[in-house]
């Protein structure tokens, strides 16, 4: 299984080792920066200060002005992201819309699907169509720097996760805010219950969004893990990023530098909300190592989160192959159908 995972992982030959950067220019628009302007701090101590302040007042860190320019063109929803970046393509959020057939008198439910890192615009669409056939209208969002939103200079979504500390935080903050903005649109269309389905990187984004938004009552985390830094440092598919990072920083310091975008920072906050959660992980995952997934589940037990667990005997990449992708899809769809 691990040999198969390695072959699937490294069939991509366009990974680039990019240099380490603190990326302080990406912090300028953060709410924490307005409260704590840089004043003689060295880059690392300033990033840590912004992380501490962001975690302490995370509602403000992930706060946003709801978009006012939602427009649905056929099956594509577009709106301007509340987070501005130097890349015009990335500043326009795209969502592919899969509406369910309306049944008079039935409650209107919807879900937002957050794909994996480097997903193409077609990936996850089959899942969305299946959910729509089950009566769950589904919006598949393009993550920051992905597919429709990818700057022309890129072949991969390298700016979403990279050895640039500030830019990675900014992309994550943008993803969380974009997802919450999608919920604003769904509410405006009359949907009374909204679920989230996040896969891999999308799972991290989904958890952060749900921890800060009561509207996401039903959540599926398809591949789950703990600290953002640990996955990047240990995971097979991010070893090129680690090569850039480890010239300057070690894992313990990286955890602190990315604390504000790490799910464990908000586990108590998540547990306080009324959520129903499904955690799916792969026993032979070399990208989201199983011991990290099991820590997530242990924390869910300790904090009394209403949750279910599915452990599949495959790996991260093989989950996208027959028969695992169909088994995975069954668990996702049936959980949403029962709980939304």
Residues covered by each model-derived region:
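N-terminal targeting or regulatory segments adjacent to alpha/beta-hydrolase or S9 domains
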Residues: 1-82
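Proline/glycine-enriched tight loop/beta-turn segments at coil->beta junctions
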Residues: 87-93, 99-111, 133, 273-274
């Amino acid at each position: 299984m691990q040999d198969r995972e390695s072959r699937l992982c490294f069939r991509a030959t366009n990974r680039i080792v990019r240099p380490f950067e603190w990326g302080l220019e990406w912090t300028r628009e953060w709410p924490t920066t307005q409260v704590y302007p840089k004043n003689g701090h060295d880059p690392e101590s300033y990033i840590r200060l912004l992380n501490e302040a962001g975690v302490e007042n995370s509602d403000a860190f992930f706060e946003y002005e709801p978009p006012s320019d939602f427009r649905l063109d056929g099956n594509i929803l577009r709106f301007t992201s509340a987070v501005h970046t130097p890349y015009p393509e990335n500043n326009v959020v795209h969502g592919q819309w899969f509406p369910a057939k309306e049944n008079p008198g039935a409650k209107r439910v919807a879900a937002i699907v957050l794909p994996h890192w480097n997903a193409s615009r077609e990936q996850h669409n089959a899942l969305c169509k299946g959910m729509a056939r089950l009566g769950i209208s589904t919006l598949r969002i393009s993550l920051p720097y992905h597919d429709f939103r990818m700057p022309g200079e890129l072949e991969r979504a390298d700016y979403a996760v990279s050895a640039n500390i500030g830019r990675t935080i900014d992309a994550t903050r943008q993803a969380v805010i974009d997802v919450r903005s999608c919920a604003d649109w769904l509410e405006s269309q009359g949907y009374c219950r909204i679920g989230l389905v996040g896969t891999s990187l999308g799972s991290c984004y989904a958890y952060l969004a749900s921890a800060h938004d009561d509207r996401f009552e039903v959540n599926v985390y398809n591949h789950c893990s703990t600290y953002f830094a640990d996955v990047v440092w240990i995971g097979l598919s991010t070893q090129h990023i680690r090569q850039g990072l480890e010239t300057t920083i070690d894992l313990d310091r990286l955890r602190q530098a990315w604390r504000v975008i790490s799910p464990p920072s908000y586990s108590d906050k998540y547990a306080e909300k009324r959520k129903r959660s499904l955690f799916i992980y792969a026993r032979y995952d070399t990208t989201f190592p199983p011991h990290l997934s099991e820590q997530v589940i242990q924390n869910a037990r300790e904090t009394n989160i209403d949750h279910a667990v599915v452990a599949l005997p495959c790996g991260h990449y093989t989950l996208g192959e027959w028969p695992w992708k169909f088994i995975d899809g069954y668990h996702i769809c049936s959980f949403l159908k029962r709980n939304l």
